[in-house]
Amino acid sequence: MRATHWVNVVALTLMVGSGLRIFNAYPMFARKGETFCCWPWEGTEVPAWLTFGGWLAGARHWHFAAMWVLAVNGAIYLAFIWLHGEWRDLVPRRGDPRDAWEMVKFYLFVRKRHPHQGKHNALQKSVYFALPWLGVLAVLTGIAIWKPVQLAWLTNLMGGYVWARYWHFWAMLLLVALTVGHIFMVFTVDPYSIPSIITGKYRPELSPEARNARPLVHLLPPRHEPPAEA
């Protein structure tokens, strides 16, 4: 399963860069001569340094190739967590909204101690649970705007070609935001988990809960004071 993380990073990077290059070929959601209600930057291109693929046709080739890699890799990941029962750690539970709020309070220094957590805290669970669904939405909306005539039922289900393209763009933005946020939190809250991505071994005594760690706070391992003399 650890390998799927690295494949996801590469595939998502290729898809985002090539997708933005495709978007720049027509940086609007409305049809020509029409207006669109929900995007204030209509007609504004994405900076070229964020794009990938060189030209429209090249970007499309990269985009479709990376799409299949991401889809197959996602299917492997979902099959793995299902077969090994790890999906139970990700499915939201009744108390998760309350626990997520406690984590927010802790990160904002309103709460002093790190809330107790299992394998993941409630905020992590919400992100990990949302990512596969966003991936599915990105794939379905992408297929809808790729084959709007052959798969008209799917395109219409998304609200038509314009809205399918809009939802596809937002799925990409949210995937990027959650991925960047995840990477930021790993490096600033739980850097000791990074070796486990390769080795699979994790030291609970260095967990964020054990260190009472917030972003960029308490990064060092906890100090164990010697017992006081009698």
Please tell me what each predicted stretch does.
Residues 1-230:
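Membrane-embedded alpha-helical bundles that constitute the cytochrome b-like, heme-associated redox core
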